[in-house]
Swiss-Prot record:
<feature type="transmembrane region" description="Helical">
    <location>
        <begin position="441"/>
        <end position="461"/>
    </location>
</feature>
<dbReference type="Pfam" id="PF07690">
    <property type="entry name" value="MFS_1"/>
</dbReference>
<feature type="transmembrane region" description="Helical">
    <location>
        <begin position="344"/>
        <end position="364"/>
    </location>
</feature>
<dbReference type="GO" id="GO:0005886">
    <property type="term" value="C:plasma membrane"/>
</dbReference>
<feature type="topological domain" description="Cytoplasmic">
    <location>
        <begin position="405"/>
        <end position="407"/>
    </location>
</feature>
<feature type="topological domain" description="Cytoplasmic">
    <location>
        <begin position="329"/>
        <end position="343"/>
    </location>
</feature>
<feature type="transmembrane region" description="Helical">
    <location>
        <begin position="549"/>
        <end position="569"/>
    </location>
</feature>
<protein>
    <recommendedName>
        <fullName>Glutathione exchanger 2</fullName>
    </recommendedName>
</protein>
<feature type="transmembrane region" description="Helical">
    <location>
        <begin position="276"/>
        <end position="296"/>
    </location>
</feature>
<keyword id="KW-0050">Antiport</keyword>
<dbReference type="GO" id="GO:0005768">
    <property type="term" value="C:endosome"/>
</dbReference>
<feature type="topological domain" description="Extracellular">
    <location>
        <begin position="365"/>
        <end position="383"/>
    </location>
</feature>
<dbReference type="GO" id="GO:0034775">
    <property type="term" value="P:glutathione transmembrane transport"/>
</dbReference>
<keyword id="KW-1133">Transmembrane helix</keyword>
<dbReference type="GO" id="GO:0015297">
    <property type="term" value="F:antiporter activity"/>
</dbReference>
<feature type="topological domain" description="Cytoplasmic">
    <location>
        <begin position="570"/>
        <end position="615"/>
    </location>
</feature>
<dbReference type="GO" id="GO:0071944">
    <property type="term" value="C:cell periphery"/>
</dbReference>
Length: 615
């Protein structure tokens, strides 16, 4: 494997030696001379560093350090998603769990683009360190929060750090691997999920989050940064090694000659390069539309509140303003329409959106559903929630080797979507009661296989469709669509929950005070009313009713999910970091093979022509 993971280093070095000629062609190609050259130099630095990873020991070190970093991120995320439920429960606002999730996802939409674009300009490592600082700040604020608004504010900082570290870790692994082995490298940070599901439940039980959730979150302010140190030191060492090469010195000398512009020019460049106006418009728009859906419920008659209505209308207007800005004024639009017009780009992005939409709509309230309506312990519930990650992580090395052999991914994504349909059907059938244990486990296993076949495969397909200069941007857009799907999915599930659950609890319990407790603090409720009690049975029936609605919506959304998979292109995963030949405007030009619907249509035409000729 070692001889083919990164590709032919001699080709990379020869390309680097031609950098001066390319710069001369590009330096005056448009008004953004500073942006062109600075971005170009950072990408070339990555290519020189990539050549240093040709040695087997450095490849092993890269994968190992990514594993350690991924372990810190993944274990914290797994535990914190549970601790968030206990935090909202302590505020007696557990029903607003999805509101926190929506706020996280909305913030992610804008931050993904910022990280991806700045990483081309300032380098991956610098942005990785910035993301780590946000991560620590958010963790500290969340741990000290005494009310939901303060916890949500901490979630903004934490989520900026979380999505940044994930995105930049993906970009770092992509820079230093070939397309053929890209899947293997990217899954290295995911392998900790082989271990996490079996220890997270025990950790949660031992940590007693109902009383100690604040300290349980706070400890990650120093545990997580420790997990990032190995990969940070490795990149710094490889940068030191690269600085000793003639190519690096030549590139730095040329960079000093080409450096132009002062502070004002840099700020103007960043304003247009990041599309600050576009980011603000889409972030505020989504916040105005999605967050009120999880806040309004019939018990408080908030839908009759003029503030809720005005917020929704404002969000819709801002969204149309965003589209107009992107089409008419943005110099570097968040959604590069020319790039997105090719089905090799828009189809995988559609798959990404519906993949995360269906996941969040089905799993946003899965942990409380397991505890309240399926008689699972906190340990068992945590393991079931994390079972899909375990399945995907365990099978990922074998899947990555298969991908390296076949070098194609489209059929895998189609199979993953089909598995999602089966998974959602099982979640619909086994949505509550003592007989749901085995069915939910089966659904979780299939969900893991679906995630394995879809999620990272779509990232690699998109990276295979673009050049190195566009790789970070298109990866950032993919992450943005994933968070957009997550935001809307969490918002829809939250809206259904807040609109339906209170009435069902009032109806089945027949006691307004008891219904309020069951709705606002379900974990407290189940400790007072054991399994089999009439009150608990009434709550279980309410949960089953609401889950039926949520899973019906999720099952319906697998149809457009499957449709988008049919239109994807199927680029070959070559033994280089990206396709650089046969490109146009940063997009790889592939033979315009027909999508599967066109092929089916052609097949029916062929059959009809045969029948006519037979007559």
């Amino acid at each position: 494997m070692s001889s083919s993971v990164v590709g032919a280093s001699s080709n990379k070095k020869s390309g680097i030696r031609q950098s001066c000629e390319i710069i001369e062609r590009e330096r005056h190609s448009n008004d953004d001379t500073y942006s062109m050259t600075s971005t170009f130099f950072k990408l070339k630095e990555n290519e020189i560093m990539s050549a240093q990873f040709d040695s087997l020991k450095y490849k092993i070190l890269l994968i190992s350090t990514a594993f350690v970093c991924g372990f810190g991120i993944s274990l914290d995320y797994t535990l914190r998603s549970t601790y968030t439920g206990y935090a909202t429960n302590s505020y007696s606002e557990h029903s607003l769990l999805s509101t926190v999730q929506v706020i996280n996802a909305v913030v992610s939409v804008g931050s993904q683009v910022v990280y991806s674009r700045l990483s081309d300009h300032f380098g991956r490592l610098r942005l990785f360190l910035v993301a780590t600082i946000f991560y620590i700040m958010g963790t500290i604020i969340q741990s000290q929060a005494t009310r939901l608004t303060m916890y949500a504010a901490g979630s903004v900082f934490y989520n900026c750090g979380y999505v940044g570290t994930n995105l930049l870790l993906t970009l770092i692994l992509s820079d230093f691997s070939s397309l053929k082995w890209r899947m293997f490298y990217q899954y290295a940070s995911y392998w900790p999920y082989i271990i996490i599901p079996w220890i997270s439940g025990n950790i949660i039980t031992a940590a007693n989050p109902q009383k100690n959730w604040s300290w349980n979150i706070a400890m990650w302010a120093f545990i997580y940064p420790l997990s990032t140190l190995p990969i940070i030191f490795l990149i710094l060492y490889m940068k030191y090694k690269s600085s000793k090469t003639a190519e690096w010195r030549s590139l730095k000398e040329q960079a000093r000659k080409e450096r132009t512009g002062g502070l004002f020019e840099n700020l103007v460049f960043l304003f247009w390069k990041l599309d600050i106006v576009g980011i603000l418009l889409i972030t505020v728009s989504l916040g105005c539309i999605l967050v009120p859906l999880t806040l309004a419920n019939e018990t408080s008659q908030k839908w009759h509140n003029s503030k809720i209505i005005a917020t929704l209308v404002s969000g819709g207007c801002l969204f149309f303003i965003f589209l107009y800005w992107e089409a008419k004024f943005a110099k570097s639009p968040l959604l590069p329409f020319k790039l997105l017009s090719d089905r090799g780009i828009w189809a995988p992005l559609g798959v990404t959106f519906f993949n995360f939409f269906t996941f969040f709509i089905s799993c946003d309230y899965l942990y409380p559903v397991l505890l309240v309506s399926m008689k699972e312990s906190s340990t068992s519930a945590a393991r079931i929630v994390n079972l899909p990650d375990f399945v995907a992580a365990t099978a990922s090395p074998f899947y990555s080797l298969l991908v390296a052999k076949t070098r194609k991914l489209k059929l895998s994504v189609i199979g993953g979507c089909a598995a999602w349909m089966v998974c959602m059907g099982l979640f619909y059938k086994y949505r509550g009661g003592s007989g749901s244990h085995e069915g939910v486990i089966a659904a979780s296993v299939i969900m893991g296989l679906s995630g394995l076949l879809c999620s990272n495969s779509v990232i690699v397909i998109l990276q295979a469709m673009t050049t190195h200069s566009r790789m970070a941007v298109i990866t950032g857009i993919q992450y943005t669509f994933s968070k957009l799907g997550a935001a809307i999915g969490a918002s829809v599930s939250g809206a259904i929950w807040t609109q339906t659950m209170p009435n069902q609890l009032y109806k089945n319990l027949g006691n307004d005070t008891l219904a309020e407790i069951a709705y606002a603090s379900p974990y407290t409720f189940i400790s007072d009313y054991p399994w089999g009690s009439p009150e608990r049975d009434a709550v279980v029936e309410s949960y089953r009713y609401v889950q039926r609605i949520i899973m019906t919506v999720g099952l319906a959304c697998t149809v457009p999910f499957f449709t988008f998979t049919m239109f994807m292109r199927n680029p070959e995963l070559i033994d280089k970091a990206t396709h650089e030949e046969f490109t146009e405007d940063g997009l790889v030009v592939l033979p315009d093979e027909e999508n599967i619907f066109s092929q089916i249509k052609a097949l029916f035409r062929h059959n009809r022509s045969n029948k006519k000729s037979g007559c």
